[in-house]
A protein has these predicted regions:
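Amphipathic alpha-helical repeat scaffolds of TPR domains
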Residues: 1-7, 34-56, 71, 82-102, ...
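Non-membrane alpha-helical segments in proteins
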Residues: 1-12, 21-25
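Eukaryotic acidic, Ser/Thr-rich intrinsically disordered low-complexity regions
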Residues: 117-150
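Alpha-solenoid repeat scaffolds
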Residues: 32, 76, 80, 101-102, ...
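Residues that mark the junctions of alpha-helical repeat units in TPR/alpha-solenoid scaffolds
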Residues: 1-2, 77, 84, 110, ...
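Alpha-helical junction/boundary sensor with strong preference for TPR arrays
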Residues: 28-32, 73-77, 95, 121, ...
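Alpha-helical repeat scaffolds
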Residues: 16-25, 55-76, 103-124, 150
């Protein structure tokens, strides 16, 4: 029953409860319900990333849940490379958002932010070469050259 309630918390958008309960389930070694073919870490990472991508595309905030789960993805959870790469890509793209929620390096005027975004995107590419960040990284490099002329 606990597993079903945990999934339900995500379904109704109660991410505070869902994440907390999923972390408890992970700590206790509990399995996901039989209709979910992933472990808890993959389920939470997939669910929160899908939600964050939709929110960001509409220009809405994704915190605190994005960072909370991203910390787990980077440190505690062993996820497949493809999903981990998607998280790093999303982290980079979030730093580049314009007023409409689109990743646009030309909208960023701070070199440190651009460099951090490029760092996350490079990590994504290192984990999964087909994650699709090459063009964005080239645009970041161009923007950095504009901001830091020699």
């Amino acid at each position: 029953m606990f597993q079903l309630l945990t999934v339900w918390a995500f379904d109704v958008g109660d991410f505070d409860t869902g994440i907390a309960w999923a972390e408890l389930a992970i700590a206790q070694g509990q399995h996901t319900p039989s209709n979910i073919k992933r472990d808890w870490a993959h389920f939470v990472a997939d669910t929160v990333l899908e939600w964050a991508e939709k929110q960001a595309a509409e220009g809405h905030a994704v915190e605190p849940w994005f960072s909370q789960v991203f910390d787990k993805v980077r440190g505690d959870w062993r996820l497949n490379e493809r999903l981990t790469a998607k998280w790093f890509k999303a982290a980079g793209c979030l730093l580049l958002r314009d007023q409409d929620g689109q990743p646009r390096p030309s909208a960023v005027g701070d070199s440190a932010t651009l460099e951090q975004a490029d760092h996350w995107l490079a990590q994504a590419e290192k984990l999964h070469s087909k994650v699709g960040v090459n063009t964005l990284r080239q645009k970041i490099a161009m923007r950095l050259r504009v901001l830091n002329p020699e």
